[in-house]
């Protein structure tokens, strides 16, 4: 299926039995594209698979006093932590694409070349889902849990102290992820505090820009310029999956077109609202 001796796609349609394998081939190629471009595992604390379009996540919002494990005298009432369902349902988004190709364009192409196109569809799905996750981190999931915002000391100018303020905003959570746009990443890496020979060597050798404040840096166009999201990836976000990658396939005989519809349905919910915060540089 790959390499110089790769078969053409028409091999799938040589027999009825082999044609039945085509949707599975499409599904696996799209999933591979999602996995290769997917940054969601870096920000998701847990993934929940459901068999319904309605889902309410749970939440526990203890006060500062309730977070303290105080001494309990013998026979005294033990303080409780309440876990409840959220008021608003998790918003699920159905993302997909229809792949339409003529018999000629499809059947006479090599499988490995066609796989590249399918993997790109998967990559687009992954990027769109990551944008959905970013939106929930910033604006909340509809349960009045938008991220706290920290503003830069000087509008339009990013300083090391601004990043420290973001770091402190997450207390008692651990800042281990920073999400920002490419242009904002350049500003971060241009700060004098992050300019050292070791960082430059690692960047040139591995493509990894380093870990400012010990946090993994994620670059994406899903975040507006001048905005930096900081979060504790271990307890900030839940991914809710109603339908994994699904492929429906048919053909239009009168036009000799092959059609494959690729869809996936998922949404995101906040677990602990205080585990994410936003730095607005302006």
Question: Across the structure, where does each feature detected by a protein language model lie?
Answer:
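Assembly/oligomerization interface modules of large self-assembling protein complexes
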Residues: 21-95
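Intrinsically disordered, low-complexity terminal tails
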Residues: 1-28, 282
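Generic beta-strand structural signal
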Residues: 95-97, 176
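Alpha-helical scaffold segments that mediate packing/assembly in large oligomeric complexes
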Residues: 97-170, 278-282
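Short helix/loop capping segments that flank catalytic or ligand/cofactor-binding pockets
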Residues: 109-110, 187-189, 269-271
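Extended, solvent-exposed, turn-rich assembly/linker loops in the middle of proteins
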Residues: 139-209
């Amino acid at each position: 299926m790959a390499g110089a001796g790769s078969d053409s796609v028409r091999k799938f349609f040589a027999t009825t039995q082999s044609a039945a394998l085509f949707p599975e081939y499409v599904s696996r190629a799209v999933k591979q594209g999602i996995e290769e471009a997917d940054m969601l595992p870096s920000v998701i604390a847990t993934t929940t698979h459901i068999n319904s379009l309605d889902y309410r996540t749970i939440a526990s919002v203890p006060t500062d006093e309730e977070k303290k494990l105080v001494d309990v005298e013998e026979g005294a009432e033990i303080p409780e932590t309440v876990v409840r369902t959220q008021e608003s349902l998790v918003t699920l988004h159905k993302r997909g694409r229809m792949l339409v190709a003529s018999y000629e364009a499809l059947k006479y192409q090599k499988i490995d070349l066609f796989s590249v196109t399918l993997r790109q569809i998967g990559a687009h799905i992954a990027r769109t889902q990551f944008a959905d996750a970013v939106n929930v981190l910033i604006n909340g999931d509809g349960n009045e849990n938008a991220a706290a915002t920290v503003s830069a000391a000087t509008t339009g100018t990013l300083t090391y102290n601004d990043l420290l303020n973001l770091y402190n905003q997450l207390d008692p959570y651990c800042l281990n992820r920073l999400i920002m746009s490419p242009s904002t990443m350049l500003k971060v890496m241009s700060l004098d505090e992050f300019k050292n020979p070791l960082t430059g060597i690692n960047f040139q050798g591995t493509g990894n820009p380093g870990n400012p404040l010990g946090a993994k840096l994620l670059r994406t166009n899903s975040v507006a310029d001048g905005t930096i999201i900081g979060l504790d990836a271990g307890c900030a976000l839940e991914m809710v999956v109603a339908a994994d990658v699904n492929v429906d396939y048919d053909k239009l005989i009168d036009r000799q077109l092959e059609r494959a519809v690729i869809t996936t349905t998922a949404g995101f919910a906040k677990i602990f609202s205080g585990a994410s915060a936003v730095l607005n540089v302006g």
